[in-house]
Amino acid sequence: MTSQAVRDPLKDELLTPQNAALIIIDFQPVQVNSIASMDRQMLVNNIVGVAKLGVAFGLPIVFSSVNVKTGLNKPPIAQLRKVLGNITTYDRTTINAWEDTEFNEAVKATKRKKLIIAALWTEACLTYPALDALREGYEVYPVVDAVGGTSVEAHQAALRRIEQAGAKPIGWVQLACELQRDWIRKETVPAFMDIFIETGGTMGLQLSYDKDSHA
């Protein structure tokens, strides 16, 4: 039961807190309420879990909204703003966030080549920046159970399109486990456990029972 030495986190092929950045785009009331590809409450639950992972593991986070300053849209949902606190929000008029100068510069300023992306809708605000990032040599990891589209068909077609272009789909639980990787890395275990307890569904319930039994 001996763990191997930690691989170079900057060169690791898997996602690490040191080689990845998290991008969250357009989780606003209109977009959330128009999702028809999955249960909306579960969508919110999952993106909150993703955001908590980003904070807990110290990932650079680029957070963006669309059309708030123009008055055409509302700010991001309160559940996300509570987790992310006073993080800068890059508001845009572009549907493709990659074509917004400030957003684009913020992503490149992270100096991370692995981009974990969650955006609404899958068929627009996820697809377009994902394709552009891939074209520029980034690795793109769409969090498939924390994004949604205006229909199941639109969501699935969009994911196929970006996967065919080279994107690497990932689920939020897979993301959590990939960032943690080893229980011996004790500094992040408490947050890892708490995120599952708060947002991990039936698995979270089991962990909460186990945690209580050892309290």
Q: What do these predicted regions represent?
A:
Residues 76, 102, 128-132:
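A short acidic, amphipathic alpha-helical/loop segment
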Residues 82, 105, 131, 135:
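Short, well-ordered alpha-helices that flank and scaffold nucleotide-derived cofactor binding pockets
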Residues 114-166, 170:
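A contiguous pocket-lining binding segment that forms or flanks enzyme active sites
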Residues 95-97, 109, 133:
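Long, charged low-complexity segments
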Residues 71, 98, 124:
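Short alpha-helical
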Residues 107-113:
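Glycine-rich phosphate-binding loop signature in dinucleotide/nucleotide-binding domains
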Residues 92-105:
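Short phosphate-binding loop-to-helix
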Residues 2-93, 109, 139, 154-163, ...:
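Active-site acidic carboxylates
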